Amino acid sequence: MSLMVIIMACVGFFLLQGAWPQEGVHRKPSFLALPGHLVKSEETVILQCWSDVMFEHFLLHREGKFNNTLHLIGEHHDGVSKANFSIGPMMPVLAGTYRCYGSVPHSPYQLSAPSDPLDMVIIGLYEKPSLSAQPGPTVQAGENVTLSCSSRSSYDMYHLSREGEAHERRLPAVRSINGTFQADFPLGPATHGGTYRCFGSFRDAPYEWSNSSDPLLVSVTGNPSNSWPSPTEPSSKTGNPRHLHVLIGTSVVKIPFTILLFFLLHRWCSDKKNAAVMDQEPAGNRTVNSEDSDEQDHQEVSYA
């Protein structure tokens, strides 16, 4: 492989690295759904990505759909940059987990860290379940309360929402002795009331939910505090995202290629310089006449 081929390969590597998006250069933007992430069929929802970093562009990405990335130019107002992505009319193919990213001017391939995930759910596709409270919807402060969501439809999962809370609790459905599919949500000792609803979903379509149950108002008498324990996990996972920040990795890969490219260029320049010096030497200095050659051969024979 010639020197120029190696150099061109190194240059090509750097060009490819420059064209590949790099995540994690800036901190993550905020991400929310307006009016909310539970959307009825055929309705439209706005996904808003915003940050106090002056991003020039925002990207919207749906998990598992690499060809469905949307780009918008950011709007700048009062020290905040934002973009509003209109999603709709809502249908099952649009449901899923979304994230957004930001990029600054002159660096379109250097993306921010991903926002927290946002689950967009389409509701109203199946019949509504029933929601009840045990021992009842009105309880004394400190009394244990359980909310039961049930239906004759063979739902695999139930989701319990409370007005004012961003995330739902979820539990798998269990078939009861009376033939219904049920999930019991233990709320623990009652400290604060609220309005609850539940939804059902199937295992093979986790973002497609039933109609909402009728709202259930739970009232607490006595001396309630400001919150109710949340013994079950929320349906949205807001931990560390699965996206790997590749900026460090690509930098580590670039270092040896930079050294190699410098070495090859230095060697190539040295070879060119030596060749130029050789071309400038007098012809007499580079030739040996026949007499000198014969004399050297004779001396070599004499010393042998």
UniProtKB/Swiss-Prot annotation:
- Pfam families from the xrefs? ig
The disulfide bridges present are C49-C100, C149-C198
Region feature Disordered, mapped onto this chain? 220-239, 280-304
Question: How is the protein disposed in the membrane?
Answer: Single-pass type I membrane protein
Which Gene Ontology molecular-function terms are recorded?
A: MHC class Ib protein binding
Compartments it resides in: Cell membrane
Domain of life, per lineage:
Eukaryota
The UniProt entry, under InterPro entries, shows: Ig-like_dom_sf (IPR036179), Ig-like_fold (IPR013783), Ig-like_Receptors_ImmuneReg (IPR050412), Ig_sub (IPR003599), Immunoglobulin_dom (IPR013151)
Example of a GO cellular component annotation carried by this entry: plasma membrane
Which UniProt keywords are present, listed alphabetically? Cell membrane, Disulfide bond, Glycoprotein, Immunoglobulin domain, Membrane, Receptor, Repeat, Signal, Transmembrane, Transmembrane helix
Q: Which residues form the Ig-like C2-type domain?
A: 42-107, 142-205
SMART domains named in the record: IG
- Topological domain spans for side Cytoplasmic: 266-304
Family (UniProt): Belongs to the immunoglobulin superfamily.
Its function, per the record, reads:
Receptor on natural killer (NK) cells for HLA-C alleles. Does not inhibit the activity of NK cells.
Among PANTHER family, the record links this protein to:
IMMUNOGLOBULIN SUBTYPE DOMAIN-CONTAINING PROTEIN-RELATED (PTHR11738:SF189), MHC CLASS I NK CELL RECEPTOR (PTHR11738)
Protein name in the entry: Killer cell immunoglobulin-like receptor 2DS4
Organism equals: Homo sapiens (Human)
Q: Which gene encodes it?
A: KIR2DS4
